[in-house]
Amino acid sequence: MKSIYVQVLIAIVLGVLVGAIWPQIGVALKPLGDGFIKLIKLVIAPVIFCTVAGGIARMGDMKAFGRVGVKALIYFEVVSTLALVIGLVVGRLIQPGAGFNIDPATLDASIAAGYVEKAQHGEGMVAYLLHLIPDTFIGAFADGNLLQVLVIAILTGFACVRMGDFGEKVAHVLDETSKLFFGIIHIVVRLAPIGAFGAMGFTIGKYGVEALVQLGALVATFYVTSLLFVLVVLGGIAWVSGFSIFRFLAYIREELLIVLGTSSSESVLPQMMEKLENAGARRSVVGLVIPTGYSFNLDGTNIYMTLATLFLAQATNTPLSLGQELALLGVAMLTSKGASGVTGAGFITLAATLAVVPDIPIAALAILVGVDRFMSECRALTNLVGNGVATLVVARWEGALDRQRLDRVLRGAPATE
């Protein structure tokens, strides 16, 4: 994997150069990035199913599994809310949108219309919960709906526990099948440099560096805030839990580079599951926390939502009282739960938030369209680190973390002596 790390880094640099020098060629490279992500997504659902179902069957204690789920949701809610608050506070202090003086009437609302339409197709809480239940067993896999696959996996695991010896045989088959899919992943990951090259070439070629210059204050504020969140907040949580955030970042550096190139944290989901298990976290915990975190624990997306909303209010001279900002925080706590780890999901979630908060003109989204792709990379990186830390923390709370193995792995030593 060390060679992959270097190759992806070189590919990202080459993608930036091609996109900047030959924009049309850069845009034409988009299928390379899309193809790589599709290959990864091809095996995500079966990997989650086999890992979670097999893990529950091996655990044998349904109460323990429920306990892990409750602890994970508590962690997600606390840290996600903290990320939203930090974005709100930074937006108030730095005021990256001050001085733009943009008249919403002069904006082309049609530019963001597609995102708004997707956001307005959101569902109520009851419909959302019902949507977690797939129409058919195969349908969840065909649609790639990770939460539906997770529901099926949990039911399958519980069924195995109740079936005694036969259930153990099924669990063994699931474990062996997961090895097959991880083998496929190891083959696909070799294509990561090509995918990163194509995706980065498209990003620079399509949107150019001009967008970064025009909205540099917002982009810089978001990147610095996210970096501080990772180092201070997640770093503090990691320290309390007995490991170094810096060593953890070094451990997942290959995955971070792939995410940087593809702007999608979902593109490394299977690899992260494998690495966290290798670091000493119990398989059943990894299988539950990581997939669930991709909908309920997107720290980077949460920071972006409140920070970007305040930026738009400031840029369009829309005053917001403290009460309105607190209302915005409450709405964001709900809409952020519908996000996912795919490229562009954060922008759609932002559109959903603005659709519910009438104070800020929704046409203001057009301001961010050109620069959102660059911010998507930072969102994805922060989301990835956040879910990785969450998994290790929940595993430690549950007594499902091999501390000695984790220390060895983060030091760069073999997992077993």
Curated annotation (Swiss-Prot):
InterPro entries tied to this protein: C4_dicarb_transport, Na-dicarboxylate_symporter, Na-dicarboxylate_symporter_CS, Na:dicarbo_symporter_sf
Known role: Responsible for the transport of dicarboxylates such as succinate, fumarate, and malate from the periplasm across the membrane.
Subcellular localization: Cell inner membrane
The protein, known as: C4-dicarboxylate transport protein
Entry annotated with the keyword Ubl conjugation: no
Superkingdom of source: Bacteria
Gene name per UniProt: dctA
Principal location listed in the UniProt entry: membrane
Coiled coil residues, start to end: none
Protein family per UniProt: Belongs to the dicarboxylate/amino acid:cation symporter (DAACS) (TC 2.A.23) family.
GO cellular component, one term: plasma membrane
